[in-house]
Amino acid sequence: NMIGVALCVPIAARFGKKTTFIAVNIALSVLSVLFFFIPVSQTGFWLMLLAQILISMLTGVMSPLVWSMYADVSDYAEQKYKTASTGLIFSSSSMAQKFGGAIGGSAALWLLAACGYISNPQTGEAFTQPDSALLCLRCLMSFIPAAVSIIAVLVVSSYPLTTAKMAEIDAQLKIQRQND
């Protein structure tokens, strides 16, 4: 994950934030789908580990990238509406992430329960899981994250704040701030 964070700035500087976001999410969706087809075996274990390392590195790129895109939205809003709304944008983004984590975590547990996952929280005892629960676990590690990444690609495809547009906004903001 830290490697991805370190790579974020040079990659986004070279290709642009929007392009980087889309490319990283496409790569995440491909790796996630491939994860489903890795056999459960000794060799498969190492392939799963490698896939998760790559997924973690790509996720590392996403974290700073998304926050820098929030800053771009803040600059865009300030330039367009002539008022700073940085606090509102960052706090609502943080709240949305918290809601997403809560809903996503709950949804995973609801899916596992619906698929017959067996647990005994009192003893922590391990159980042999039914095939439906094992399939659900594999989908939670593959197809579901891939679908979320594809949705993110579709949403960000219409994101208008390209590198050129942000250079324009930054120049206008500099003038606007000097006049205030």
Residue ranges and their predicted role:
Residues N1-D180:
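Membrane-embedded alpha-helical bundles of multi-pass transporters/translocases
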